[in-house]
UniProtKB/Swiss-Prot annotation:
This is Venom protein 59.1. The keyword Secreted applies. Its main location: secreted. Residues 23-94 form the IGFBP N-terminal domain. InterPro entries: Growth_fac_rcpt_cys_sf, IGFBP-like.
């Protein structure tokens, strides 16, 4: 499978998750679960309440994928738009 075909499969897979996305509200009660074994380190969640495992380059981030936060040195960048016009975002070098 060439890189273009892999990219198309990637977008198709991402669309499946995007359709099942439900945006989370910020309810900062500070009763956070401890994080461990984070491949890309840790970061504060989108509300600034709890430490969470960060995601790495090429991973989905932002509200598209459970409000995932990019690792240090990366930024959550717009990749395109889903069917409902919401932005698809992935972690890229800052």
């Amino acid at each position: 499978m060439n890189s273009r075909e892999m990219f198309c499969v990637f977008i198709l897979f991402a669309s499946f998750f995007y359709c099942s996305y439900a945006e989370q509200e910020c309810n900062c009660d500070k009763s956070c679960e401890p994080v461990k074994d984070c491949t890309f380190g840790t970061a504060m969640d989108k509300c600034g309440c709890c430490e969470v495992c960060a995601v790495g380059i090429g991973h989905f981030c932002g509200k598209f994928f459970n409000n995932a936060v990019c690792a240090e040195g990366l930024k959550c960048a717009k990749l395109g738009e889903g069917a409902d016009g919401e932005a698809l975002e992935i972690c890229l070098r800052a």
